[in-house]
Swiss-Prot record:
PTM annotation: Autoubiquitinated.
The protein's name in its UniProt record: Ubiquitin-conjugating enzyme E2 E2
Biased composition (Basic and acidic residues): 1-10, 21-45
Domain named UBC core: residues: 55-201
Annotated Low complexity bias: 46-55
Catalytic site: C139 (glycyl thioester intermediate)
Pathway(s) served: Protein modification; protein ubiquitination
Enzyme Commission identifier(s): 2.3.2.23
Gene name, Swiss-Prot/TrEMBL: Ube2e2
Sites bearing Phosphoserine, chain numbering: S11, S15, S18, S19
Known function: Accepts ubiquitin from the E1 complex and catalyzes its covalent attachment to other proteins. In vitro catalyzes 'Lys-11'- and 'Lys-48'-, as well as 'Lys-63'-linked polyubiquitination. Catalyzes the ISGylation of influenza A virus NS1 protein.
Length: 201
């Protein structure tokens, strides 16, 4: 009888121990759940980002209205879709230049820091030019160190058109084309017209 009584007595204590253990485990897990949550700081960061986006978006919307009403000669530009920060531009080869008759497409990407940082502008159409490389990168001072918040995308497009009329071999991205421009202008112009006909018409 005493043995059975012991078994009966032992049984609740064992189950009670496991119940306490489960409670202890659940209590210990509570802080872990709380530790997973702290991401509310991101609200402050995102609010600053939202303020930047609001400032830049207003400026871009203003420029879009201006360039739609009064586009630069031989140029057009506007958002690709719903994203105000991603534009596509079209430049017609300037009359009298080796790019005349060509239609050149460019991508324009604005950052949330615009207009305090320049837009990124790249050619999508291949072009034979000493200041524009095969990736479409443009060597233009106002897109780098000489950028100013007073500049607009219309002025940038005008500067690119000027670069198509008069390249700058003293500051080339493609050294071989710059050398050819200075030493064999006739061959340079022939190649530029050939590329324009092949890739931009």
């Amino acid at each position: 009888m005493s043995t059975e009584a012991q078994r009966v007595d032992d049984s609740p204590s064992t189950s009670g121990g496991s119940s306490d253990g489960d409670q202890r485990e659940s209590v210990q897990q509570e802080p872990d759940r709380e530790q997973v949550q702290p991401k509310k700081k991101e609200g402050k960061i995102s609010s600053k980002t939202a303020a930047k986006l609001s400032t830049s978006a207003k400026r871009i919307q203003k420029e879009l209205a201006e360039i739609t009403l009064d586009p630069p000669p031989n140029c057009s530009a506007g958002p690709k879709g719903d994203n105000i920060y991603e534009w596509r531009s079209t430049i017609l080869g300037p009359p009298g230049s080796v790019y005349e008759g060509g239609v050149f497409f460019l991508d324009i990407t604005f950052s949330p820091d615009y207009p305090f940082k320049p837009p990124k502008v790249t050619f999508r159409t291949r072009i034979y030019h000493c200041n524009i490389n095969s990736q479409g990168v443009i060597c233009l001072d106002i897109l780098k160190d000489n950028w100013s918040p007073a500049l607009t995308i219309s002025k940038v497009l005008l500067s690119i058109c000027s670069l198509l009329t008069d390249c700058n071999p003293a500051d080339p991205l493609v050294g071989s084309i710059a050398t050819q421009y200075m030493t064999n202008r006739a061959e340079h112009d022939r190649m530029a017209r050939q590329w324009t006909k092949r890739y931009a018409t």
